[in-house]
Amino acid sequence: MENLEKAIARIKEAMPGLELLENENMSAHCSFKIGGPVRALAVPSDVSSLSKICYFLKENQLAPYILGNGTNILFPDEGLKELFIISTAKLTKMFLLPDGAIYAEAGVSLAKLASFAQQNGLKGLEFASGIPGSVGGGLIMNAGAYGGELKDAVESVVLYYLPEQRLYELTKEQCSFGYRSSLFQKMGGCVLLSAVFRLEKGNGEEIAAEMRRLNQQRRDKQPLDLPSAGSAFKRPEGNYAAALIDRAGLKGYRVGDAQVSEKHAGFVVNMGKASSHDVHRLMRDVRKKVYENSGVALEPEMIILPPDYRLEDKGPAVPLHFISSPKQEEDGQGHSGS
């Protein structure tokens, strides 16, 4: 706790223009509308500022938790009094590269990324137009829907590696993408900064029509009018979580103000004043009942944040390409290092 206070004081002194919220309730920063106060929430305006914050935290043997759009996360009611969160909400640069690929920073919403691709006659991200997440968060979990996944469109990512305070570029293959998984979930100390997406040329009107069709399908089937963290459970191999939950008779099952959606059993919704404890108990009950009914052990898809988060100071798990060229500095991807 003492180290955290020192780091906060240092950051305030060195970065007076930084948006820094203290003891901020995280219920206001996630789609579930659940969560107590975090000790500090920083919202840097660019990658250079983000890297400076990370540097000051590392000086005090601390690591931040990186928050995207907060659309697949459950914060604890008790809050996170020893945690420093960095939001990527303002990291929203996006443009076409000379070779036709799309460059997007971590805070760009997936909906805006898909729309930008459509406007430029590029197909392959139609599935992402209705996913309420960001590029950074989406890549960490390899977000997908309707048969598409981000791994199918991404070419490379740039990350800031906290233990070494360096920028690295990873190819798609190095990211080890799997179903709702990636290298970044297993490797501590990674902060995704940006990505390049390689898409195929297509017809803009046809792409827009497909996006409208998928979004209408989403509105028809999903409880978009209630707070949630998206799909509560990962899809088990050869089956669907929603179908298993429905067959177990749990559609509409409720604990406090947390409820298995009556519209789509794969969602847990906040009916008004749900607590994280309500959600924990409901998910435990659902997993137990589904296992008893079908023998399938459901695995949570949403991120359930623990009360503590520490930097694991271990080396890169894969060979990485170090970036330190002046061009990266000009593009806003540079690491200040001090």
Where are these regions (language model features)?
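Conserved active-site and cofactor/substrate-binding residues in soluble primary-metabolism enzymes
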Residues: 2, 6, 27, 45-48, ...
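Anion-binding (especially nucleotide phosphate/pyrophosphate-binding) glycine-rich loop
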Residues: 2-135
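Phosphate/pyrophosphate- and phosphate-bearing ligand-binding catalytic cores of soluble enzymes
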Residues: 21-22, 73, 160-162, 166-284, ...
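Structural signature of FAD isoalloxazine-binding scaffolds in flavoprotein oxidoreductases
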Residues: 35-36, 42-47, 74-92, 140-172, ...
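Short, flexible micro-motifs
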Residues: 38, 71-75, 110, 136-141, ...
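Short, basic and Ser/Thr-rich N-terminal targeting/leader segments
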Residues: 60, 67-69, 153, 226-227, ...
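A generic local secondary-structure boundary/capping motif
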Residues: 72-73, 114-117, 125-129, 142-149, ...
